[in-house]
Amino acid sequence: MPSSSLADCFNDPATWRVIPSGLAVGTLTSAKGPDGKIGLQLDYDFRGGAGFIVARKEIEFNLTEIFDLILSIRGEGPQNHFEFKLIDPSGSNAWRYLRERFQMPADWTQLKVRERDLPFAWGPAGGGAPSAVGAIEIVIVAGPGGKGSVSFSNISLEDPTLHLTRSAVASSQISNHPPNAVLESSPSGGWQAAPNDPAPWWSVDFGGILRFGGLVIDWPSSVASRAYDLEQSADGAAWTTLHRATHASGSRSHIPTPGAESRFLRFKFASNECAGIRSITMRPDAFSSTPDEFIHSVATDFPRSWFPRYWHREQSYWTPIGSPEGTRRGLLNEEGMVEVDEAGFSLEPFILTKSTMISWADAKITRHLPANGAPFPFITWETDHAALIIQPWVDGTGNSLALRVNYRIENRTPDALRLAVAVRPFQVNPPWQKFGKLGGISPIHSITCTADEMRVDQKYVSSNHPADAWGAAAFEENGVVGFFARGQMPSRTQITDPAGLASAAMAWSAPPNGDAFEVTLTVPFFDEAKEPLPNSLANAAAHWQTTLALPDWQVPAIARDAIASFRSAASHILINRDGPAIQPGPRRYTRSWIRDSVIMGAAMAKAGQPHVLRDFLTWYTEFQRDDGFVPCVVDRTGVDWLVEHDSHGQFLWGICENLRNDGDIEFASSLWKSVRSAVTYLNHLRAQRMTPNYREPARSACYGLLPESASHEGYLAHPVHSYWDDFWGVRGLEAAAELADALGHQEDAQRWRTDAREFLQDVLKSIRHVIADRKLNYIPGSMEWADFDPTATANAIGQLDFA
């Protein structure tokens, strides 16, 4: 059972558990804390390796929104990385305080961990702040490694806001609407300035410095537009502007103030017509710790239909939209939202009635793909009012490449409806796929609208049918959706939004009683794109049919879906390419991992498209080092020199697969120097684990393996001897021998087959040793962790034929 007394947290080592990785070891004992109090000591030794050591205690307690976790710490040893983590009761979500290259204090020192020092680390919650704790973890992660000790004592949890007494003052007030009413649950409805106040303001004194991450303001009435400055001060004398609003509207406003702390806040209003506040809720740092977290927080305050699904921390799946030449591509998600370019804004449809809106959250949604698997997905909405079909595609070539989206609405009522397509500052790609600019928010700072097009920063959205209404809105107006919710369109046609959260829309009347209306929007990828021809979609489909002329597989009806799925997958491989670079995805994975690329290239070769793999190998070979090292990944920025030792075997396997499928001896011969160089480097790596000290019992399980590497994300923080690398290495040597045979290099072929056979024997011996030593009933993924890695095992058996 987890302990419930935080104050006694460090009293008993038996209530803690040590979890080491690899060769590392750790032990827990009692220690004498400051003032003679009991403490906990962790002694650790990485024994010359990398990895981590975790000390974990299950303990239950709750947290306030703002807190200080205070503990005493001392230690000695190298400057490794120190982590203090809070785990929720599910055990799945973690918040982490991290000190890299932390020099442990030799004497007892107080360490204060604030709520803003514990950002969300990982887990299905996707973000937010911790509220209930189920376990504490203290982690030492090897930097230089080595050995040392760290001791802890005197842990406490404090709420620094408890002693703060808030009070408010204002420039004026009307009867029964005093300044302090904003801070209370007052029936009077908050504070209101006097009607003759020429410069109204309202201010709060928190009674001390308060940490906060934002404000949620409820206004007393729905004034058309509010303008005000929010100012902060530490002493009530010197003020700085924290936020400025010029067109705020609606009954509630959300203001992000990441990392803010202040004693005083003051609202200065532009006029007394809008000078009133019903209530203010101060929000903690997690409210706006990142721009994406801020939108997550805002979405919880509005109806579900106002924001795309992922802002409610729900996964919305998506598929790429592109052409056979790759290069640029859009995304379509399950709800019909279309991202117009990499890290770009999105087009989102709405149906407007006289008084409200219909969105993805109100519709029965169905996803479709042509029966033959061609890459033309489309979405249908069914509602009580109307049916809507959303069909995106890409046409053109080179600099004329353009994204098209056709919307077809059928109004099934006798009433007036409008189809509105909004430009929103959100990607289809969710924030948990964040990488650089990818994922979550796509900032929009300025928009200009006309009946025919919207200029969104430097990008254009044009319509083949003039809109009946158009307009733009800033975030402080709740965006265009704030108007849609009232069945309206915004009236401003040109805006700038310093927050980068501008939105806009075009709307068209949908004829009543079942008649259909359709409109096509165009978003050029480059400057030379033209308006779509009437048969644009049919031409794009014909282009795909010609380009992806797959073999005429004869299969029974039960297997036709499998062939269609293969066609879709092959199409996606082409869509996601960037010139010769084969990339496993359209956004986060726009990088060429040798692993993914040769497997996908081999699939395309089997599908009658051998040039895809051949072009890739020609391009990738340029990045091989002179010593034969094959990089694991290359992207637009160049080579990533991260060590993943599966890359060398994959490179050799890919060249051999190309020869098997297209029989091009001349091409294989042109890469022979690269083949020999990769084999030499592969054997050089293996030789590092064949020295006498690796025959000693403590290291014998590593004998003959490839050295440690970060062959997948799970090993990034602490590289290990990965059997995934080894299986690829064995198969790479076998592939090299096959190439040598085909090219007439018999001595090389014989030698490399021997190398492969001996390598495989050492790998199997190591696996058997780990299984016996750790008492496993599965094939481990690595020597150090003995981890269950079904992907690696399936790859060895299925892809590489080690059965």
Whereabouts are the PLM-identified features?
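Extracellular carbohydrate-recognition regions
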Residues: M1-L23, S156-I174
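Disordered, acidic Ser/Thr/Pro-rich linker "stalks" and the adjacent N-terminal cap
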Residues: S30-P34, Q41, E158-F212, D218-Y228, ...
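Extracellular ligand-binding interfaces
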Residues: Y44-P124, G145-S151, S156, V216-R244
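Beta-sandwich interaction modules
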Residues: E60-F61, P119-G128, H243-G276
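Hydrophobic/aromatic beta-strand segments within beta-rich folds
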Residues: L69-L71, V113, V133-V141, A168, ...
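Terminal accessory carbohydrate-recognition/targeting modules of carbohydrate-active enzymes
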Residues: A275-G276, T281-A557
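Substrate-binding groove/exosite segments of carbohydrate-active enzymes
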Residues: G487-A507, T546-S669, S709-S711, H721-Y723, ...
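The feature captures the catalytic groove of carbohydrate-active enzymes
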Residues: G500-P534, P584-P586, V634-Q650, N683-E758
